[in-house]
């Protein structure tokens, strides 16, 4: 059976995105530097060879630990699930060929027809909850895994429901001082076991297996 996982970049102080990176603050000059902060958070991804080639940003790029993690994550993912806030922001920012190349199920109250993009990405809009989205994802994942792409609220919902098998944090050397906390509202009933730690010049990658039960 497909595993359910997430892999996200987090700041050293535990935030998933910088303050102001949402539609509510679009155009607000107070938060105009969020793009630069987001770039720092993802400095381990953006220059890698696999990322650049996959998104058709040009040849070349960095190889090594970060590149291997990006490629492995992309190849193991057969379908993604994301929240509406992540989709709303991405709809404005992603290139025409969205960077998933798989089906994507969007958690939303909005009724909308599937949105087909070049390159193999089709966004499907799910109105009846996280378990329905997961059932639909399993039906199309094949022998690959299911990634909870974000944002924080979607990840938290799946963690609280006991539906996540493993996750990896790419901890970047940047402080945000605010924004959505990745594990806000997650209690002791979500237990984790450390599986692997890998370091690169840009981030520390920590992988955990998830189990139900109080954390020791």
Segments (PLM) and residue ranges:
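Enzymes that bind and transform nitrogen-containing heteroaromatic metabolites
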Residues: 1-216
């Amino acid at each position: 059976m497909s595993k359910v996982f997430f892999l996200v970049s987090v700041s050293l102080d535990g935030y998933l995105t910088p303050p102001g990176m949402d539609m509510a603050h679009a155009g607000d000059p107070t938060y105009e530097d969020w793009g630069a902060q987001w770039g720092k958070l993802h400095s381990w991804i953006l220059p890698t060879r696999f990322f650049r080639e996959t998104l058709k940003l040009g040849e070349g790029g960095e190889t090594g630990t970060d590149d291997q993690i990006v490629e492995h994550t992309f190849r193991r993912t057969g379908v993604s699930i994301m929240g509406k806030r992540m989709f709303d922001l991405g709809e404005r920012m992603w290139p025409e060929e969205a960077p998933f190349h798989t089906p994507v199920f969007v958690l939303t109250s909005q009724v909308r027809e599937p949105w087909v993009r070049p390159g193999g990405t089709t966004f499907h809009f799910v109105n009846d909850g996280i378990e329905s989205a997961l059932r639909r994802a399993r039906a199309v994942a094949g022998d690959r895994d299911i990634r909870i792409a974000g944002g924080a609220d979607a990840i938290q919902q799946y963690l609280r429901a006991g539906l996540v098998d493993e996750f990896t944090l790419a901890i970047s050397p940047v402080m945000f001082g605010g924004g959505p906390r990745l594990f806000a509202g997650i209690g002791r009933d979500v237990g984790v076991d450390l599986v692997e730690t890998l370091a690169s010049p840009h981030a520390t990658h920590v992988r955990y297996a998830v189990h139900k039960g109080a954390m020791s």
